Amino acid sequence: VHTSTSPTATSAASGTSSTSSHRFRWRVVDIVVASVIGVAVGVVFWAWGVVWGPISAPIEALLPGLQAAPAAVWVIAGVLGGLVIRKPGAALYTELVAAVVSALIGSQWGGLLTIEAGLVQGLGAELVFAIFLYRNWRFPVALLAGAGAGLAMAINDLVLWYAGAAPLFATVYTISAVIGGALIAGGLAWLAVRGLARAGALDRFAAGRELRTV
C-alpha cells in the first residue's frame, strides 16, 4: 500500500512547525526585559537577605522549618520571568540573573552557593512551565510554578544546609517552602504581570496583549 501526502497537508504541517518554532524563539527584547527583571529582582533578593535574620528568627522559633515560607521571596524571579517572556528557558535565565546580581552585591551565603541556589530554583519553575508545554499561563499554573520553585529550594537547602535534619523539620520545611513558593512567588508574580500589562509595560509581549483583549 502506498500512501502520499498532499502538498496542502505538507504545507500546513510545515507552517505549524514554523509558527511553533518562531513562538519559542527569543527576540532581543525578550533578552533585554528578562535581564532587567533579573537585575531588579536580584536587588530585592539582596535586600531580603539583609533583613532575613530579624524576619526569620521569630518564625523559626515558633516552629522550626516554618521560615522556609518567607524564604520563597528568593524564588519569585523565575516565575515572574517565565510569565512575562513565555519562552523556554525564561524562568531559569531570570532566576539565575537575579541570583548572580544578589551574589555580586554581597550575599551572606557566599557567591557560588547563591548562584547554585538560583540555578536550582529556576529549574524548579522552568520544569512546571515545560510540563504545560509553555502554552498555559493562567493563575493555577503560576501557583504551580511557584510551588515547583519552592520545592526545588527546599530540596537544595535540606541537602546543603540542613543535611541530617530531623524528619519533622524536613517535612515542615518542605511544606512551608512549597506553600510559600505558590503564594509568594506564584501569586505575587502573577499579580505583578497583570499590573504591568494594565500599565502598558508589556505591550510587546503576549502577556500584555492577552490581558488587553480580555
Residue ranges and their predicted role:
Residues 196-214:
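Short, highly charged, low-complexity non-transmembrane loops/tails of multi-pass membrane proteins
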Residues 159-171:
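Membrane-helix boundary connector in multi-pass membrane proteins
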Residues 38, 116-158, 190:
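Short helix-perturbing small/polar motifs within transmembrane alpha-helices
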Residues 130-135, 183-200:
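Membrane-water interface at the C-terminal end of transmembrane alpha helices
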Residues 38-46, 96-105, 147-157:
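Aromatic-anchored segments of alpha-helical transmembrane domains
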Residues 2-4, 18-81:
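Hydrophobic transmembrane alpha-helices
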Residues 31-36, 72, 76, 88-96, ...:
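Hydrophobic alpha-helical transmembrane segments
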Residues 98-127:
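Interfacial aromatic-anchored transmembrane helix boundaries in multi-pass membrane proteins
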